[in-house]
Amino acid sequence: MKIEFVTTHAHQTVTFAGEELCSYLQRMLCREEGRFSVSLAVEPREGNDAFRVETGPSGGTITGSNPRSVLLGVYDYLHHLGCRFLTPMPQTEVVPEIPRDRLPARYEKQASFRHRGVCIEGANAAQNVLDFIRWLPKAGFNSFFLQFRLPYTFLARWYHHMENPLREPEAYTLADAEVHTALFERELQKRSLLLHKVGHGWTAEVLGSSAMGGWNAVEETVAAENLDMAALVDGKRGFFQGVPTNTSLCFSNPRTVDTFAERVVSYARRNPHVDCLHVWLADGFNNICECASCQKTTVSDQYVQLLNEIDRRLTAEGLGTKLVFLLYQELLWPPIRARLRSPDRFVLMFAPITRTFERSYDLSEVRSSIPEYVRNRITLPTSLGENLAFLRSWQARYDGDGFVFDYPLGRAHYGDFGYLHIARIIGQDIKKLRQMGLNGYLSCQELRACSPNMLPDYVMGALLFEENADVEERITEYLEAAYPGRTRLARDYLERLSELEVCDYLNGKGPRVDPDMARKLSAAAGLCEQMEQQLDSVPDTPHWKALRHHNRCIAHLARAMEALASGDREAALRLHRQLREYICRMEPEFQGWLDVYRLLDVTWNYTGFRAC
């Protein structure tokens, strides 16, 4: 069959959408005769991404509210015809052959939320990032966040092969990261995906340092001419615990505000293609300036005053850059007096990094008040109700656009060995966003959160586009496509693993010696060992091969964690070494499925093997 598209809208994303449609349909209709012609059109309108599909046996139209929506409509139509985009890895796509009579369709959709995206974390080869960007619109997402000025630290971790002594480190420089970042941004622009940038690093730059080392400590000290802009903590000014990214500033110093604001405005001036520019303060907590002038107010009041100054300067230059401000660590406490003067300039980002992932948000648990703020003596909230109380306190002072920046696939997911629990938590959370007064979700996560599969992200993308979608139907759809023929075997195994989830324990919450936890982990390891022989007889397809690898990985991890929870530190360390040896040895074969660096980093530093 001859497949073609026509359009009168000269936009690279619309043209790309047509090329994608033709490429996939050519494969799907390879045995059919005749012609199929689709017209791609843009009918601009305000609001969330929306598209309309109207096709018959010989062709039709796909219309979007913007160029990106045309592309989203194309991928949704392909999904309607039976395609399944299960992971960012092209070899995992399901592209069925279909008869011509399957082509007719008539429906329209509008995204439930404005903000639907992912933020880079973990360790990534450039190809991992490119594959992920190319997958985003196939899964219904519209945004991608490249942290820092350059995502150098997330790329260098891979090329330096951190945590894997079996691989020789490769050279990787800031210049390499610049080349790769330009490539990433071209791919995002090709798809009209919203680009989020920076976030971390501003405070380090104000002090004349670079944040390109991520969260690593440095030997350098703050230059004498900049020392007065560093926070005074415990009677000293300098890099907080040696880490520039974690160093707060003295915001009562006018030079600090001037320098910070000028850096943001200069960046916005030179990068007009950035859709959402994140303006964050230092990472870490209990690191706020204790000088007499700063103690007259709160850091959140100072933050809002800084944002207002940046807004004033952007407005003076005619720059319409959207600024994202952060509710995180000390900034969970709202300002007492200061208010944003131009709310439409800003987007609120709620980042409950210390929340539990054992259960979803319960809006009936929201507390009526928040704890008193005590400078550099805060304890971060862990309960969902307390986290939501902080959000409500901010929303009483700001009623503009906002989204949640959440972490289910940052650390806690490694404790859900079957990925069904965390997928359901994500789905339940998204269904509550509207009640929470939020217009979307950015997931701060490893891009290779794909062991045993990519089900959590698949559910995330689907629910963010259609909040009323049935989570269980999406789970079934995914598992049937990933494990055809013996879906029941895979599902039963993954369900049983998820019943034994230990998300909070793996993430460092609760006592490290816990007999009940040890019994649960013993059961998980035993289940993996029982299943090993059955999994050796399954088809040799990508998802089944990955599930076999995952089975062996979890058997090692669960046994190591069982020893840790039993208080046997010597055995825990020995078994963790066995886990390390196995996943490092297997990394070349399963690089796209498991972020070896991140799993080892999290279990060492958060689960507690470092202390053994």
Where are these regions (language model features)?
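Short, hydrophobic/amphipathic alpha-helical patches that form generic packing surfaces
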Residues: 19-24, 68-83, 138, 454-466, ...
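Short, solvent-exposed alpha-helical surface patches in well-structured domains
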Residues: 72, 258-259, 489
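Generic structural signal for residues positioned in beta-strands
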Residues: 4, 37, 52, 61, ...
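Contiguous, structured surface segment used for ligand recognition
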Residues: 1-113
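Catalytic domains of carbohydrate-active enzymes that cleave complex glycans
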Residues: 437, 462-612
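Aromatic-lined carbohydrate-binding surfaces of glycoside hydrolases
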Residues: 9-15, 29, 47, 112-398, ...
